[in-house]
Amino acid sequence: MAIERTFSILKPDATARNLTGAINAVIEEAGLRIVAQRRIRMSEAQAKTFYEVHAERPFYGELVSFMTSGPVVVQVLEGENAVAKYREVMGATNPAQAAEGTIRKKFALSVGENSVHGSDSAENAKVEIAQFFDEKDIVG
């Protein structure tokens, strides 16, 4: 199995409830290492660029507003099959459908306020990581 990296965001609904430590514990218990982490306030420009793939979707404006409404924690996670592993650990987008023990089942408030983002592919992880971190910021 290949060691790879994925990108994670702890969203404003999670940071507002001081869940960074609790979510990090779930991530680490799953065997993923947090090799870079930064708490930031995402600008509107950053959010629009990051979620550009959703620009034509009806929820785009609301998503950008939500992601800029408070601090977020951006992270690089590393481990065997990190992208798939983290998606499993996050759980379904809708917390009502998420498996027991997943981040979204434990912490998400709703489909929109679902506490975390994770890359959907290794290729997208590289692009997303590069938007927030230089290679020198990632320490494994």
From Swiss-Prot:
GO terms for molecular function: ATP binding; metal ion binding; nucleoside diphosphate kinase activity. GO terms for cellular component: cytoplasm. Keywords: ATP-binding, Cytoplasm, Kinase, Magnesium, Metal-binding, Nucleotide metabolism, Nucleotide-binding, Phosphoprotein, Transferase. Signal peptide: none annotated. It catalyses: a 2'-deoxyribonucleoside 5'-diphosphate + ATP = a 2'-deoxyribonucleoside 5'-triphosphate + ADP; a ribonucleoside 5'-diphosphate + ATP = a ribonucleoside 5'-triphosphate + ADP. ATP binds at K11, F59, R87, T93, R104, N114. The keyword Metal-binding applies. It is an enzyme of class 2 (transferase). Homotetramer. The gene is ndk. Major role in the synthesis of nucleoside triphosphates other than ATP. The ATP gamma phosphate is transferred to the NDP beta phosphate via a ping-pong mechanism, using a phosphorylated active-site intermediate. InterPro entries: NDK-like_dom, NDK-like_dom_sf, Nucleoside_diP_kinase. It is found in: Cytoplasm. GO terms for biological process: CTP biosynthetic process; GTP biosynthetic process; UTP biosynthetic process. The keyword Ligase does not apply. The active site is at H117. Its EC number is 2.7.4.6. This is Nucleoside diphosphate kinase. Belongs to the NDK family. Its cofactor is Mg(2+). It comes from Methylobacterium nodulans (strain LMG 21967 / CNCM I-2342 / ORS 2060).
